[in-house]
Every structure is written in structure tokens, then in C-alpha cells.
Amino acid sequence: MHVKKGDKVMVISGKDKGKQGTILAAFPKKDRVLVEGVNMVKKHSKPTQANPQGGISNQEAPIHVSNVMPLDPKTGEVTRVGYKVEDGKKVRVAKKSGQVLDK
């Protein structure tokens, strides 16, 4: 998967096209990611002891990983991802600026 938890990404297709956010969770087996503030759905919850009121809340739903692209840390634009071996470790590199995406 070309993106990881904590990456700044932009949605490149779908109803939330153009929105930016941080990846909250990644689901590699399903090829989906959870992006902050994107693909909001209404969740209905029954009253419980923890939440006696119950009601409707908004929360993020996962979107397919092909619909997001990481933002270049140098320019802030979307970029493709390349891979390079540095100090014996495989790191992700922004194709536009050549800057390393992994911390």
C-alpha cells in the first residue's frame, strides 16, 4: 500500500474529491483507508448505559486506497510514490520532489 497511517493525503476521486486529511487507519487486506473528515456517514446508536441519550452521530467510513494520493511534504501538492533503499531500509519517496515520505 502506497500510504500509511499518519500520512497527509488528498482525495482524487469520488464525492469528496479535492478534500485533504490525515489517514487515521489503514486496512491493507481490504485496500481501504480511513481519512479524517472524508466520507462522513451517519451512525445510529441505541441508548446504552454509557450513552443513555443514544441518537445519530457522524463518523468517517473507509474509502478505497486508489482514491487518495499523498501530499508532497515540500510543495504540498499530490505526488506519486517511489521506493528507494537507504541505509539498508526500504523507504517511500515523493516522485515530484524526491523527498522521503517515511519519518
Curated annotation (Swiss-Prot):
What HAMAP family would the database entry show? Ribosomal_uL24_B
- Oligomeric and partner information: Part of the 50S ribosomal subunit.
This one is known as Large ribosomal subunit protein uL24
Instruction: Identify the InterPro entries for this entry.
Output: KOW, Rib_uL2_dom2, Ribosomal_uL24, Ribosomal_uL24_CS, Ribosomal_uL24_KOW, Translation_prot_SH3-like_sf
Q: Which SUPFAM superfamilies match?
A: Translation proteins SH3-like domain (SSF50104)
SMART domains linked to this entry: KOW
Gene name tied to this protein: rplX
Per the record, its GO cellular-component terms are: cytosolic large ribosomal subunit; nucleoid
